[in-house]
Design a protein with these regions (language model features):
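PRPP-associated nucleotide enzymes
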Residues: 1-155
Length: 155
């Protein structure tokens, strides 16, 4: 298998529509929350099963805090298993509003989250990101032309 789309159960319907449109197989990531709110994730690769060279991870980043940890864990395990190319499909991209420090000590989350994504993924596709004082998504997520912002406006 060359490419696979991975998704979480709460986003199954849109992820499967995307997989069908792209002609890709899709599989769910198992997610368990422990009483202390830690997460246990399991990628859908069985013992002896071929690992795809490329994985598209579908994860919208609304209510982002747990989901950013999920990205970190999934990307780390996918790399450990031998996945060579990780692409993030995030219809909503969180933490893009805070693009400047208005007061001393304020965290510029856009820069930090953008660097985090670029560190773990070779590409990003999102829709209408909050880019207030910058012109292009690539300024926030340093992936060059592999950081793609689509418009949700009707054509």
């Amino acid at each position: 298998m060359d490419s696979l789309l991975l998704y979480f159960a709460d986003e199954q319907a849109p992820a499967l529509r995307l997989a069908e449109a792209l002609g890709l197989p899709a599989a769910a990531i198992e997610r368990h929350r422990f009483p202390d709110d830690e997460l246990r994730l399991r990628l859908p690769f069985g013992a002896g099963q071929a690992i795809p060279r490329q994985v598209l991870l579908y994860r919208s980043l609304d209510r982002p805090n747990d989901k950013l940890v999920e990205l970190l864990l999934v990307a780390g395990e996918a790399r450990a298993l031998g996945v060579q190319r990780l692409l993030l499909v995030a219809p909503y991209l969180a933490y893009m509003r805070q693009d400047i420090a208005f007061n001393p000590g304020e965290v510029v989350s856009q820069t930090i989250v953008g660097a985090f994504i670029a560190q773990h993924f070779e590409g990003l596709v999102t829709v209408d990101p909050h880019l207030h004082r910058i012109e292009r998504l690539q300024q926030a997520v340093p992936l060059g032309e592999a950081a793609i912002a689509l418009s949700g406006a009707p054509m």
